[in-house]
Amino acid sequence: INPSGIYVDVTYGGGGHSQEILKNLNSNGKLIAFDQDQDAIENKSNDSRLNLVKSNFKYLNNFLNYFKINEIDGLLADFGISSHQIDNKDRGFSTRFNSKLDMRMNSAQKIDAKTIVNDYDKDQLEYIFKNFGELRNYKKVTEKIISERAKRPIETTGDLKKILSPLVKVKDENKFL
């Protein structure tokens, strides 16, 4: 790391990676970090070298222009959900808890996982599970969800886990569910 460099963390999360970058920067160094999750924003390090932007990193170029930054020395991207999102039962990411089916990266977004599994049509669900979930058995998953939601709404992570468990090998449960 260049001690006086400019770095970007596009997935701030709990701030652990950003803290490591900041440890290696001198007073001239800068770190621009992005996160759309309010919990991450509230977890912000109080460091004048850090600009934490509450936004999706897809707007990276816009914000670099705003901060008048033409070149960066490095970029960190730790994609996926963060441990604090998994450990918070109210976020609805983990099947360790039976909680509301939420799973929003940004809790201010209107559409949650409950809406998706209960309201999206077959083609939309298949597209999501195939392309974002990278599931080989996306058609079976979709069929099972559509069949079960016809009986009653899928409300919780526990409901979803119960519905999908027959489709998952025990060794793959943590990866799949």
Spans of features found by a protein language model:
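S-adenosyl-L-methionine-dependent methyltransferase catalytic core, i.e., the SAM/SAH-binding region
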Residues: 1-177
